[in-house]
Amino acid sequence: MDASTLEALKILRKADVPVMLTLAPEMVPGDTIRQIVDMGVVVSAGHTNGTTAEAKAGLDAGISCFTHLYNAMPPMTSREPGVVGTAIGSDAFVGIIVDGHHVTWEMVGIAWRARPKRDRMFLVSDAMSTIGGPDHFELYGEQIEVRDGALVNAAGSLAGAHIDMVGCLANLVQQVGVPLEEAIRAACVVPADVMGRAAPNLGSGTPLPELLALDKDLKRISL
């Protein structure tokens, strides 16, 4: 975590811009994490090789969220819960990609049911430019393309997701079996809670562009 990053965070927060920062807790000292949290930045653990102890130390320092559970973090084992197990067992917010490629339906369900507070789970699309655009793009010099519904590089490794939030919502209900009301909260309300923002409030006068209408099969319909 260099000085220029800290300065950028200060500038954004001084302008009252909501900021979430994903970091690897084993790479950033606890005092620095506390400093960032004190700025009003939401700090999330992710893209990490951290151990259980390092993940817990990050929580103690003020980390309040985990980025796309299971992905870009070591797998949980019977002797080393790691970041995954720490996230599931914590009261922190946890995001998860529900596209069937990043995480199997069964593993989504296990995490969802195991959380001590299920209203701390939220959906992440991890969508890339193929949603509404061409089926390929370049990222860090690599060609990324849609293959069998997944976004992959030439080696077949995942590189973002080819799904939007409505698709994640439908999968959570239809494939994982989460109740619709709970799934809607995970898509619309909990993300606002993560950032400390007011939850969406639908009512008379709500601008049409802020609304989505879905049919009984959770497919988007025109308003």
Question: What residue spans do the PLM features occupy?
Answer:
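Conserved phosphate-binding/catalytic loop of the ribokinase/pfkB sugar-kinase fold
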Residues: 1-14
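Acidic (Asp/Glu)-rich catalytic clusters
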Residues: 12-16, 59-60
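Acidic, metal/ion-coordinating pockets
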Residues: 14-16, 25-34, 38-41
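Short beta->alpha linker loops
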Residues: 27, 49-50, 187
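Active-site-adjacent C-terminal substructures of enzyme catalytic domains
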Residues: 32-36, 42-45, 50, 54-182, ...
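Small/polar glycine-rich anion-binding or flexible loop at a beta-alpha turn
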Residues: 184-193, 204-208
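C-terminal cap of metal-dependent C-N hydrolases
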Residues: 198-223
